[in-house]
Amino acid sequence: MIYSSHSLIRYSAQAFHCLATVCLLSIASHGSAQTLFGFDANSSAQQRQMETDFDALIDRDEMDAWLRDFSSEAHHVGSPKSKENAEAIAELLRSWNYDVEIAEYEVLFPEPLARELELVAPNRFTASLVEDPVESDASTSNTDNLLPPYNAFSIGGEVEAELVFVNYGTPADYELLERYGVSVAGKIAISKYGGSWRGIKPKLAGEMGAVGTLIYSDPADDGYGPGDVYPNGPYKNDSGVQRGSVMDMPTYPGDVLTPGVGATGDVNRLRREDAPTITQIPVLPISYRDALPLLEAMGGEV
């Protein structure tokens, strides 16, 4: 897991305020055969019967139709389809006699302006950074309003440096690299998804002095290794990329500009440059198809 290739990340992000919609619903969970906490013997039996009746109303085909509709278009936070989905879910819940409120928040949500990844030595390679459509799944060809593969709340930036493979990018991995005399300081760390939450990877890499992070799904973990890839199974094909936030949630979750309070229209907000949960180095997720030429170009011990 040593290094010797070079890689270039050009990655910038634009942030804007958007409207996020949320539906909340609390449903009681099944208890044991004993008296439920907060219920006497009679009311426990009534509660269990209500839950049994509720379960009997669940229709698998109906749920499949809802899921297909909700996921038929890109529906990231603040998108038209996200709002449409929230309103549709709210109406369904109201039809079942639930009291539903859609709460509106103005949160910071970054989108990438440009994404580039190039290997410049010992040979040249330009990553595609795209996911191939799946012929049997029409939704994968619908690119209207579709955001490209990226990690939200990565800082923007452009770096060129040597590439170091850091396995899963966990503390144990960095301890092993240190024993081999390998440092990521001033370099780009490339790690596999897994082993820890993805937001920990750029956080640790930055603390170790790295100037950028690449993250890919290794096929041994999420690909042909454990089973069939999509659409024949649940695992990623060679162009699949895991998206998701890399904000420093252990510091605080939620909107990066309004720690500890709801992101309503009149609340005080941090400046973006002062938000501690935005990464300190650029992060870019890639497929294992794009990762392979980078890994093949590397030298050193394995």
Please give the residue ranges for each predicted region.
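N-terminal secretory signal peptides that target proteins for export/translocation
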Residues: 1-13
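Bacterial N-terminal signal peptides
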Residues: 15-27
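Sec/Tat signal peptide C-region and signal peptidase I cleavage site
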Residues: 29-33
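Noncatalytic luminal/extracellular "stalk/propeptide" segments of secretory-pathway proteins
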Residues: 36-49, 56, 68-185, 219, ...
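Second-shell loop/turn segments in exported
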Residues: 50-57, 71-80, 150, 190-195, ...
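Sec/Tat-exported extracytoplasmic proteins
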Residues: 58, 62, 67, 71-81, ...
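Soluble metallo-hydrolase cores and metallopeptidase-like ectodomains found primarily
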Residues: 136, 141-176, 252-302
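A conserved hydrophobic secondary-structure block that centers on an alpha-helix together
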Residues: 167-231
